[in-house]
Amino acid sequence: MFNFWGSKEQQQGQSRPSPEASATPWYSPSLVTSPSSSRPQTSGQIPSHVSPGEAAGIIAILKDKSVDELRKLLSDKDAYQQFLHSLDQVTIQNNIREELRKETLHLARENLEKEPQIVELRNQCRIIRTSELATAQEKLNELENQREEILKFYSPGSLLHRLQDAMNQVDEESEELQQKFMEKDIDTAAFVQKYKKLRSKYHRRALIHLAAKTSSIG
């Protein structure tokens, strides 16, 4: 009997889904056709860079699987994850990540255990800054002031000023000696000896003062 369009058998054939159509992939189909993709990737995932040796090893494992097993990897996310974590490369990376996690936790625990010591050291540093450092700073300021006074005392201007005061003092002593001689309070011989000594001292200091002043100006 001829089957016409719209017959019951044809409608049943059209409404029955095929086995291949029922296996809907859990990833985007466009990712499978990508030549640079060595495994199914979720949408938005950045492709990982695999070395040629690792890629060859993965391909060798996939070549040993049947078509049904490959289809299951493409359609079943759990099966794919199980296969992925069975790879040596993934196992090594997971082990490294676990070791890093444990090491990080270990360092964090050590830091927490050393927290009291760190606080104690901070307190000691604060005490040093507020006490010992303050005392040392005060002593340093005192020494700086002494140094400034010494430099000021022995500066050319200060030396000339003191030399001028010494000249004036000798000049005053000479005038007082003259006054005593005029009042007959000292004899001539003693007056001449003392007056000569005073005037020699005055002129010697005057020459030094003149030489120092000339040198500082030059």
From Swiss-Prot:
Residues 137-218 form the VPS37 C-terminal domain. It holds the Pfam family Mod_r. Residues 8-17 have a biased composition (Polar residues). The keyword Transferase does not apply. InterPro entries: ESCRT_assembly_dom, Helix_hairpin_bin_sf, Mod_r. GO terms for biological process: catabolic process; protein transport. The keyword Transport applies. Its main location: other. Keywords: Endosome, Protein transport, Transport. PROSITE patterns: VPS37_C. Residues 28-40 have a biased composition (Low complexity). It is found in: Endosome. Residues 1-51 are annotated as: Disordered. GO terms for cellular component: ESCRT I complex. PANTHER family: VACUOLAR PROTEIN SORTING-ASSOCIATED PROTEIN 37 (PTHR13678), VACUOLAR PROTEIN-SORTING-ASSOCIATED PROTEIN 37 HOMOLOG 2 (PTHR13678:SF22). Component of the endosomal sorting required for transport complex I (ESCRT-I), composed of ELC, VPS28 and VPS37. Interacts with ELC. Component of the ESCRT-I complex (endosomal sorting complex required for transport I), a regulator of vesicular trafficking process. Required for the sorting of endocytic ubiquitinated cargos into multivesicular bodies (MVBs). Belongs to the VPS37 family. This is Vacuolar protein-sorting-associated protein 37 homolog 2. It comes from Arabidopsis thaliana (Mouse-ear cress). The lineage of its organism: Eukaryota, Viridiplantae, Streptophyta, Embryophyta, Tracheophyta. The gene is VPS37-2.
